[in-house]
Amino acid sequence: MTNSDGTGRFIVFEGGEGSGKSTQATRLAERLGAVLTRQPGGTELGGQLRSLLLDSDAMVSDRTEALLMAADRAQHADELIRPALAAGRHVVCDRYTGSSIAYQGHGRGLDPADVAMLSAWATDELSPELVVLLRVDQDTAA
């Protein structure tokens, strides 16, 4: 789906592991005919960074992890999200800045304000128009 004014809408799903965000993001993207993407891993570079970050043998420091996530987000915004929006396409993204604030900020003990600032700089302040936060209890997520 595209907008007649030439600008797409940017929608992000956030939530803990097992909250259903990937399922709901997929459903919404299909319903809207939108571009579906995720972070990390929405681009070729992002896929490589995702593999590195998920590799339990990789000895990545907390700050390095935050910087790699910001690098993924910068590439993702420039290569995929902005061009799609400019073409009038809606973009639905599974995770975005909120996940970095949660995982690298609160989870890794980095200053959440620093993580937010880094993400804003990496994306040149590209913000979603809507963030859907899915919250479920641990029993539901398990």
Show which residues each predicted segment covers:
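Conserved phosphate-donor/acceptor-positioning beta-strand/loop module used by diverse small-molecule
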Residues: 93-95, 124-142
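Hydrophobic positions on the alpha1 helix immediately C-terminal to the Walker A/P-loop
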Residues: 24, 28
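ATP-dependent small-molecule kinase phosphotransfer cores
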Residues: 35-123
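Hydrophobic anchor at the beta1->P-loop junction of P-loop NTPases
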Residues: 13
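Conserved lysine of the Walker
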Residues: 21
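Conserved phosphoryl-transfer catalytic core
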Residues: 30-34
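Phosphate-binding P-loop
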Residues: 2-8
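Walker A (P-loop) phosphate-binding loop of P-loop NTPases
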Residues: 18
